[in-house]
Amino acid sequence: MEKYVVVLAAGKGTRMKSKLYKVLHKVCGKTMVEHVVDAASGINPTKIVTVVGTGAGEVEKILANKSDFAFQEKQVGTGDAVMTAKEALGDKEGATLVVTGDTPLFTTDTFNELFKYHAEKGNAATVLTAEAPNPFGYGRIIRDNQGNVLRIVEQKDGNPDELKVKEINTGVFCFDNQKLFEALKHVDNDNAQGEYYLTDVLEILRNNGERVGAYKMPDFSESLGVNDRVALAQATKTMQRRINEAHMRDGVSFIDPDTAYIDADVKIGNDTVIEGNVVIKGNTEIGSDCYITNGSRIVDSKIGNGVTITSSTIEEAEMDDNTDIGPNSHLRPKAIIRKGAHIGNFVEIKKAEIGENTKVGHLTYVGDATLGKDINIGCGTIFSNYDGVKKFHTNVGDHSFIGAGSTLIAPINVADHAFIAADSTITKDVGKYDMAIARGRQTNKEDYWHKLPLSKDKDWE
């Protein structure tokens, strides 16, 4: 059986009170519509068609390699939205999954179970349902005495008895494709909203003698539709718990999983430990046997094995195996920390490579520089890379020693085995085995204390 998917993503989402198109709001680093399309892709469909509306260019850009598109000019109901996919799917044989783009928690497993049930029962239509603790706002599943699905009644159209029903429509359906598009021709907008409801297709099919069924999924939380910021936060919390549990099952330890925020595409190796209040975002990859302490933030970075990150921020950077950083340090974009290097506290590194086993201990800025291996950078060193117009590069060779409080004014080259005395301001290249001293000479004034006003203060005697 060929499988097809229609994703409904044309809604404006006015309750989000946002300039951003509703399905583009993110849940754990991915837009809601990406979550839906990725879950649907897991069933290996022949084609996915995403229905978009005015101003949906960003949706098309994000899903360009994952979906075809249909355009709904006016948002006049889910039935009309699905009908826009007729040109792409109307003549196809097989089954079509219809799902909304604002339901990011659905899983591939649930979609597979729905298709399986649909095929086994020989249904023309199967609705995915769930038992809701509080069904307010959802369409209710109305069954006959034998348990067969008669219709779905929307909140604003239901009578008191119908609204007591707790089995709800999740907004996900599986249809015989050709019967779906034939039935859509007969859907009207005679309802309180004046819209063309996709749910009316079920009653039309049933009246035509077709078999209509329902598959009740066990986990109601998957069906959460995001219509406002409250629901967005709920979806994020649920997704975060799911992500963290998956990592724990794969051998990652979380000290406090409730406060660790990990994006959906993050990869983490086994035997890594993550403390609470840690944020890991984007396409970050973290190796095995790492330790990440509270307050750390890692974005779009690659972390090797055996790395320790202590309360530090890492953005678009790389840390090789057996390196460490922190506390309170910052790797900015294009920072590369080679194997065995040590980055201490209050260090900022930007667009610089730190060589193997090099130590940058504390209170240092390294920008636009290449440092070799086995170098010691003293406390308070500054790599001065900007003249107000352009940025310049500094090179420091292997086995060099940069004394505390030094300033290296780019562009300069410091050769291998060079020594820079503390508190020097270096403006010229330093040769191999050379020592550079660039500071004022010390002068001692004998007995100068007694010339100071403080010398007459008894507390200072």
UniProtKB/Swiss-Prot annotation:
Residue ranges, annotated region (Linker): 230-250
Catalytic residues of the enzyme: H362
Chain residues that bind UDP-N-acetyl-alpha-D-glucosamine: 8-11, 22, 72, 77-78, 139, 154, 169, 227, 332, 350, 365, 376
Binding site for acetyl-CoA: N385, Y386, A422, R439
Positions of region (Pyrophosphorylase): 1-229
Subunit structure: Homotrimer.
Stated family: In the N-terminal section; belongs to the N-acetylglucosamine-1-phosphate uridyltransferase family. In the C-terminal section; belongs to the transferase hexapeptide repeat family.
Known role: Catalyzes the last two sequential reactions in the de novo biosynthetic pathway for UDP-N-acetylglucosamine (UDP-GlcNAc). The C-terminal domain catalyzes the transfer of acetyl group from acetyl coenzyme A to glucosamine-1-phosphate (GlcN-1-P) to produce N-acetylglucosamine-1-phosphate (GlcNAc-1-P), which is converted into UDP-GlcNAc by the transfer of uridine 5-monophosphate (from uridine 5-triphosphate), a reaction catalyzed by the N-terminal domain.
Protein's name according to its UniProt entry: Bifunctional protein GlmU
